[in-house]
């Protein structure tokens, strides 16, 4: 047992070293700036783009300086959701496609989305048309910068896959690193703005309220993430001394923080598309109205965000907890739930529980990170606060997931004598 513990510690240390190397490469990429971009104009463009700023931070991107990894994992995350939707359409029969080809299809979709996003961003800023010998015109410069941004996004997908194989946390580590880097900067900017605009008693009280709210939200997120519905399981092959420890745990919020990341990414995608179209059709009234109405500070944009968030909260619950697989595993191991027949009845029972819990989780997400955005329609400052609440939930969930993965690795192969010989 002692030798197994040492091996587990060595495994965790090895994976942590790989993750450290991958994060180091990620940080280098964030500091490789794309030439020919007007940084001041980019900052002005991002100034009122609250959702874009938050999305950029929660996908590992860095638009503030237009670096190699400016797009982050946003295109890949959007492609993953779109592919998941396509697999639900039975006519396409995409579930039978091999994993290798599925990955290539998702990469292709991510590249298309990446080009749309890069063009949408570049079209709002001035660029130097002579950034290289291959780009002597405005169009050539845009194409070159777009290619660099998309290449960085694809490399980031590969980097996250390497961390999934060799390190700890997969792509979540890169997103976590990005959020940790961005947070001190955003907090310091907020404090400086208040100091410059005369730091009075009201500003001090507001900052104290914000700090207390952040602490409360962190504690609430931890409690919700750790809360479980435990379904007792009878295990025929397990020693009766351990019977009371046999249960199927299902989180109260089965989807975790993933719906927040993906809902933000999906909501910003139509904005990118309209921004790109607006570049080619600058005087089109429909495009301008669309851009104005789907903003996160408008009723339509907020409502769309809440609907997407609610739907993804239920969808991700069934991705994280597969009732079909659980029912099959229980039946194969001769285990069963009290008063529930093995097989289809068990699957339906677990499906019902997951749906109920996911509905509760969806309401929780909507109330904490969705409905407060309606206050931003009155005052845009509240939009920033509401989106920050969502990013806190994401941050806490990412940290919890990484800690759980490390615990699982440390206790790997540590089994008690549960089974009869």
Curated annotation (Swiss-Prot):
Listed GO CC annotations: plasma membrane
A Gene Ontology BP annotation from the UniProt entry: intracellular protein transmembrane transport
The entry's keywords: Cell membrane, Membrane, Protein transport, Translocation, Transmembrane, Transmembrane helix, Transport
Transmembrane segments: 17-37, 69-89, 102-122, 139-159, 165-185, 204-224, 254-274, 299-319, 358-378, 383-403
Location(s), subcellular: Cell membrane
UniProt keyword annotation of Membrane present: yes
Record Pfam families: SecY (PF00344)
Keyword check for Signal: no
Membrane topology (UniProt): Multi-pass membrane protein
Main location class: membrane
Subunit structure: Component of the accessory SecA2/SecY2 protein translocase complex required to export cell wall proteins. May form heterotrimers with SecE and SecG subunits.
Similarity comment: Belongs to the SecY/SEC61-alpha family. SecY2 subfamily.
Function: Part of the accessory SecA2/SecY2 system specifically required for export of possible cell wall proteins. The central subunit of a protein translocation channel.
Official protein name in the record: Accessory Sec system protein translocase subunit SecY2
């Amino acid at each position: 047992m002692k030798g197994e513990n040492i091996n587990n510690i060595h495994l965790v240390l090895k994976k942590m070293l790989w993750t450290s190397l991958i994060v180091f490469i990620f940080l280098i990429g964030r500091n490789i700036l794309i030439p020919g971009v007007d940084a001041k104009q980019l900052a002005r463009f991002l100034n009122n783009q609250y959702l874009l700023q938050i999305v950029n931070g929660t996908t590992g991107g860095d638009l503030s300086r237009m670096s190699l990894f400016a797009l982050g994992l946003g295109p890949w995350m959007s492609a993953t959701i779109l592919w998941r939707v396509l697999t639900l359409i039975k006519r396409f029969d995409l579930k039978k496609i091999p994993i290798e080809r599925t990955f290539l299809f998702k990469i292709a979709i991510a590249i298309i989305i990446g080009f749309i996003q890069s063009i949408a961003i570049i079209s709002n800023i001035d660029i130097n048309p002579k950034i290289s010998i291959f780009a002597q015109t405005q169009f050539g410069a845009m194409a070159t910068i777009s290619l660099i941004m998309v290449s960085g996004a694809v490399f980031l997908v590969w980097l996250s896959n390497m961390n999934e194989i060799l390190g700890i946390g997969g792509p979540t580590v890169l997103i976590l690193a990005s959020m940790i880097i961005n947070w001190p900067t955003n907090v310091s900017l907020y404090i400086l703005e208040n100091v410059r605009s005369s730091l009075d008693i009201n500003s001090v009280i507001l900052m104290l309220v914000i700090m207390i709210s952040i602490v409360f939200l962190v504690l609430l997120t931890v409690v919700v993430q750790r809360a479980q519905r435990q379904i007792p399981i009878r295990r025929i092959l397990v020693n009766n001394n351990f019977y009371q420890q046999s249960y199927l745990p299902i989180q109260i919020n089965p989807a975790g923080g993933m719906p927040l990341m993906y809902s933000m990414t999906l909501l910003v995608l139509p904005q990118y598309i309209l921004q790109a179209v607006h570049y080619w059709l600058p005087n089109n009234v429909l495009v301008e109205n669309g851009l104005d109405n789907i903003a996160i500070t408008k009723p339509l944009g907020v409502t769309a965000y809440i609907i997407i968030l609610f739907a993804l909260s239920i969808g991700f619950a069934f991705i994280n907890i597969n009732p079909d697989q659980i029912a099959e595993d229980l039946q194969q191991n001769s285990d069963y739930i009290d008063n529930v027949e093995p097989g289809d009845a068990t699957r339906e029972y677990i499906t019902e529980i997951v749906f109920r819990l996911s509905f509760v989780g969806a309401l929780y997400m909507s109330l904490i990170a969705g409905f407060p955005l309606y206050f931003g329609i009155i005052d845009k400052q509240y939009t920033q606060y509401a989106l920050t609440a969502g990013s806190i939930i994401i941050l806490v969930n990412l940290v919890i997931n990484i800690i759980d993965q490390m615990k699982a690795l440390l206790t790997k192969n540590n089994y008690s004598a549960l089974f009869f010989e």
